[in-house]
C-alpha cells in the first residue's frame, strides 16, 4: 500500500513541477492542474477505503466535481484568450479585465 501512495505522491509532485515549469502557457498549466487533482482524488479515495471511513465516501466525488468545474472555467479562459489574442500565454489574462 505504501508504494501506491508513494507513486501517487510522485505523480502529484511531477504535476506540481510541471505547473512551475510551464507556467507561461495556459493549456500546459491546465493539464498539470488536472493531473494534480486526479492524483489527490485517487489518494483520498484510497485513504478512505483503507481506513473504512464509509461516512465520508462522498468527499472524493465532491473533489471530482470541483475539478470538473475548474477544468471548465480554465477551458473557457483558454478559448477566450486564444480567440482574442491568438495565443495561450498567461500574461494575456491581465488584458481580459473590464
Swiss-Prot record:
Core subunit of respiratory chain NADH dehydrogenase (Complex I) which is composed of 45 different subunits. PANTHER family: NADH-UBIQUINONE OXIDOREDUCTASE CHAIN 4L (PTHR11434:SF0), NADH-UBIQUINONE OXIDOREDUCTASE SUBUNIT ND4L (PTHR11434). GO terms for molecular function: NADH dehydrogenase (ubiquinone) activity. It comes from the Eukaryota. Keywords: Electron transport, Membrane, Mitochondrion, Mitochondrion inner membrane, NAD, Respiratory chain, Translocase, Transmembrane, Transmembrane helix, Transport, Ubiquinone. It is a multi-pass membrane protein. One of its GO terms (biological process) is ATP synthesis coupled electron transport. Gene3D superfamilies: 1.10.287.3510. This is NADH-ubiquinone oxidoreductase chain 4L. InterPro entries: NADH_UbQ_OxRdtase_chain4L/K (IPR001133), NUOK/Mnh_C1-like (IPR039428). The gene is MT-ND4L. Its EC number is 7.1.1.2. The lineage of its organism: Eukaryota, Metazoa, Chordata, Craniata, Vertebrata. Core subunit of the mitochondrial membrane respiratory chain NADH dehydrogenase (Complex I) which catalyzes electron transfer from NADH through the respiratory chain, using ubiquinone as an electron acceptor. Part of the enzyme membrane arm which is embedded in the lipid bilayer and involved in proton translocation.
Amino acid at each position: 500500500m505504501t508504494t501506491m501512495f508513494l507513486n501517487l505522491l510522485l505523480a502529484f509532485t511531477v504535476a506540481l513541477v510541471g505547473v512551475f515549469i510551464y507556467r507561461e502557457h495556459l493549456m500546459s498549466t491546465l493539464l498539470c492542474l488536472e493531473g494534480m487533482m486526479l492524483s489527490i482524488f485517487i489518494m483520498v479515495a484510497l485513504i478512505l477505503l483503507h481506513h473504512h471511513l464509509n461516512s465520508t465516501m462522498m468527499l472524493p466525488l465532491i473533489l471530482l466535481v470541483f475539478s470538473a468545474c475548474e477544468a471548465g472555467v480554465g477551458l473557457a479562459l483558454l478559448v477566450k484568450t486564444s480567440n482574442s489574442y491568438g495565443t495561450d500565454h498567461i500574461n494575456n489574462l491581465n488584458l481580459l479585465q473590464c
